[in-house]
């Protein structure tokens, strides 16, 4: 199982900002773009139940800031949904999370899902270039910094489900990790490490009939 681990010098541990020190809202940005986003993210949150981990050691989070760079502690990305395994679902085993701080947890998400919308599609598909003195794009953060093993994007308008897996160039291990597109037979992705699948499901959720992205067990959708 590939789980990104992040380490920091012990001398800095006590001086680093904690979850309580960092903003929990999306600074300077509007709220969720439509009704679909929170419903779809909530379905992912509810169905992410990896059988290899106790529920209290699984974080299934939606619309939560992820702080990823201790050198720039206010830089963050805010995935529509992400899952982490091997960490407490509570902050320091006791508190509901305001955000997810990589330099405290030292474990990257194992999977991130972004729900495409017209204003964010280019960045979420890695089609934008970072400008000088600006934070890295979502794609760069997920691929290069956090090295999130599975990155998924879902376009509700085209009913298009795409997934990428982070891989190192075996011929040249010194090269950085890169996302490679995965084949998705029947619009399904099986995550063997988690004994869990992710796929497009036709059904009624919260009173709405349609196509939804959800996790499923080996027994199927």
Report residues per predicted region:
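C-terminal interaction segment
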Residues: 2-33, 47-50, 68-73, 89-111, ...
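Acidic-basic catalytic patches of nuclease active cores, encompassing PD-(D/E)XK
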Residues: 34-82
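Short, surface-exposed beta-edge/turn micro-motifs
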Residues: 79, 148-150
């Amino acid at each position: 199982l590939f789980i990104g681990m992040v380490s920091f010098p012990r001398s800095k541990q006590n001086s680093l900002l904690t979850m309580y020190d960092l903003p929990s809202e999306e600074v300077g940005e509007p709220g969720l773009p439509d009704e679909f986003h929170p419903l779809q993210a909530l379905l992912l949150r509810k169905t992410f139940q990896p059988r290899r981990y106790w529920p209290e050691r699984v974080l299934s989070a939606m619309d939560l800031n992820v702080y990823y760079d201790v050198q720039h502690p206010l830089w963050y990305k805010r995935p529509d949904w992400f899952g982490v395994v091997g960490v407490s679902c509570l902050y320091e085993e006791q508190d509901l999370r305001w955000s997810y701080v990589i330099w405290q947890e030292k474990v990257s998400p194992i999977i991130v899902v972004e729900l495409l919308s017209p204003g964010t599609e280019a960045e979420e598909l890695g089609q934008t270039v970072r400008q000088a003195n600006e934070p890295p794009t979502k794609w760069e953060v997920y691929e290069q910094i956090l090295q999130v093993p599975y990155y998924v994007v879902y376009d509700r308008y085209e009913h298009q489900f795409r997934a990428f897996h982070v891989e190192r160039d075996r011929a040249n291990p010194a090269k950085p990790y890169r996302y490679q597109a995965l084949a998705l037979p029947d619009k399904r992705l099986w995550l063997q490490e988690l004994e869990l699948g992710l796929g497009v499901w036709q059904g009624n959720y919260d009173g709405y009939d349609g196509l939804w992205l959800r996790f499923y067990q080996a027994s199927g959708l």
